[in-house]
Curated annotation (Swiss-Prot):
GO-annotated cellular components: plasma membrane
Keyword Magnesium: yes
Protein name: Phospho-N-acetylmuramoyl-pentapeptide-transferase
UniProt membrane topology term: Multi-pass membrane protein
InterPro entries assigned: Glycosyl_transferase_4, PNAcMuramoyl-5peptid_Trfase, PNAcMuramoyl-5peptid_Trfase_CS
Gene that specifies this protein: mraY
Pfam family, one: MraY_sig1
């Protein structure tokens, strides 16, 4: 177990060391966040905070994984996929900065890139990385061979996870803190499965998030942007794919699911009844507008993330 902590520590240290120069570089680029006018009014003060900060933990994750993981197709695939989704986010963030608007890529452009990468990842996992096309149904012991439908499931999972993390990234330290616990859960799971490369990757991901929180917790000095949130979602989604826990991910990453459901329910309720279920969605804004300080909301959701991660691990033991 001590060996498994090395990737976490190395990624955290690299992220911490890179923080000051990367933040200075982003300020020189004037890569400030444009805040949406329809969000909580308290967030208007965050305008101008450097964005695209996800590159910080991405570098920490990459360095730690390459240094400590045995070189293999799986190691390289996890990094390439994570950076592929990060690149979509980087383009999106860059357009926001250049055009001085809260929206970057068009939705269909963003979604198209995510689906394409997801399909490629699904095929690669099935044919070249030894994952196969069988999914396991938790608790029941059932197995289901999807054959060539599996890449579709993989793409759906990756697109859903990346966008769920993106929705969760709405408060200082929220997405990074939640992903820290989900990544730790996957590190423990991969350790029990004897998947050494995934142990290193998952723990390095947790370490990168930990180091990033030093700069991202309230009041944040940098935001991860879509660069970071899409990368985190891809990393978690691919961990689920390669550990064959696609159907357990909604529990392990339960907070992501709650955030996404709150948005869906809000839209459906308003269209059907003209009323909103929540003060604002995603769910974290509901608590924020209810008078909770931002840090309290974040810590509450972190605690919920820990509970859900433990519940997911327990589910796999039944």
């Amino acid at each position: 177990m001590i060996e498994a902590l090395k990737p976490l520590v190395l990624a955290a240290v690299v992220t911490l060391i890179l923080g000051p120069p990367v933040l200075a570089f982003l300020r020189r680029l004037k890569a400030g966040q444009t805040v949406r006018s329809d969000g909580p009014r308290s967030h208007l003060a965050k305008a101008g905070t450097p964005t695209m900060g996800g590159v910080l933990f991405l570098i920490g994750l990459t360095v730690s994984t390459l240094v400590l993981a045995p070189p293999s197709p799986l190691t390289l695939s996890t990094l390439i996929l994570t950076w592929g989704y990060a690149l979509i986010g980087l383009v999106d963030d860059g357009l926001k900065v250049i055009l001085h608007r809260p929206l970057g890529l068009m939705a269909r452009q963003k979604l198209g890139g995510q689906v394409l990468l997801g399909l490629v990842a699904g095929v690669a996992a099935m044919l070249w990385l030894g994952r196969g096309s069988v999914i396991q149904v938790p608790v029941t012991g059932w197995h289901w061979d999807l054959g060539w439908y599996y890449p579709l499931l993989a793409a759906l999972l990756l697109v859903a996870t990346t966008n769920a993390v993106n929705l969760t990234d709405g408060l200082d330290g929220l997405a990074a803190g939640i992903t820290l616990w989900v990544a730790l859960a996957y590190g423990i799971l991969a350790l029990t499965l004897g998947q050494g490369e995934l142990v290193t990757f998952a723990m390095a991901l947790a370490g990168g998030c930990l180091g990033f929180l030093v700069y991202n917790f309230h009041p944040a000095r940098v935001f991860m942007g879509d660069t970071g949130s899409l990368a985190l979602g891809a990393a978690i989604g691919f961990l689920a794919i390669m550990t064959r826990t696609e159907l357990v991910l909604p529990v392990l990453g339960g907070v992501y699911v709650l955030e996404t459901l709150s948005v869906i329910l809000q839209v459906v309720s308003f269209r059907l009844t003209g009323r909103r279920l929540f003060r604002m969605s995603p769910l974290h804004h509901h608590f924020e507008l209810g008078g909770w300080p931002e840090s309290r909301v974040v810590l509450f959701f972190w605690a919920l993330a820990i509970i859900m991660a433990l519940a997911g691990l327990y589910l796999l033991t039944i």
